[in-house]
A protein has these predicted regions:
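C-terminal cap/linker of serine protease catalytic domains
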Residues: 1-2, 13, 36-37, 58-64, ...
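Conserved hydrophobic positions within beta-strands
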Residues: 14-16, 73, 101
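Short, compositionally biased
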Residues: 66-77, 124
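Catalytic nucleophile loop of clan PA
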Residues: 91-112, 124
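Extracellular/periplasmic catalytic domains that process cell-envelope and extracellular macromolecules
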Residues: 19-21, 44-47, 65, 79-81, ...
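Conserved active-site neighborhood of the chymotrypsin/trypsin-like protease fold
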Residues: 1-63, 81-85, 140-149
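Conserved hydrophobic/aromatic beta-strand scaffold that supports enzyme active sites
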Residues: 25-29, 68-72, 85, 167-169
């Protein structure tokens, strides 16, 4: 059993709609409307060096509150020049998988997937282009997910405040 969890809300059961083992991603469906969602970047430009913020729920055994980290996009390819991934420097821990990488505009440009143990800044995320393709393949219109893009850069506290209502912990089991 998979459920979305958030303090102050009842758990929402969800089903796996699509998985992509190669990129370590899954698309989940809930049978009720979510209060909000994050805008996904539609168009590309060179993201190398861009500041990013990650928001997620790592190491939930130590606490289930939202955690915020910052860094930069350090590389535009993954291990072995895999173009599905980008490398970033924001610190992550076990349980960070699925966390969004957000630009200062509040747009999702990636989703955390993995890190290389015992290294520094060897963290990877699936690029927004693959996320957009997965959403589109399930009949979702990504251009409708651009409602909340700031025209001016936001501070990290502003990004956090704007985004946190759309973030839920994905839990397995009772």
């Amino acid at each position: 059993q998979i459920a979305l969890r958030k303090q102050g809300y009842p758990d929402m059961e969800c089903q796996v709609v699509l998985t992509d083992e190669g990129s370590d991603t899954a698309l989940l469906k809930v049978n009720q409307p979510l209060p909000s969602y994050l805008p996904v970047r539609e168009r590309g430009y060179d993201l190398l060096g861009e500041q990013i913020t990650t928001l997620g729920f790592p190491l939930t055994g130590f606490g289930s509150q939202l955690q915020v980290t910052q860094g930069n996009i350090a590389g535009l390819q993954g291990i072995g020049n895999d173009i599905r991934f980008m490398q970033f420097t924001a610190p992550i821990q076990p349980g960070s998988s699925g966390s969004p990488l957000l630009l200062p505009t509040g747009e999702v440009v990636g989703m955390v997937t993995h890190t290389i143990a015992n290294t520094q800044n060897m963290n990877y995320a699936v690029k927004y282009q693959l996320l957009s393709a997965l959403l589109t393949s399930c009949g979702l219109n990504v251009s409708e997910l651009t409602h909340n893009i700031s025209q001016t850069p936001l501070s990290t506290p502003q990004i956090t405040k704007q985004s946190k209502s759309a973030l839920w912990l994905v839990g397995c089991g009772a």
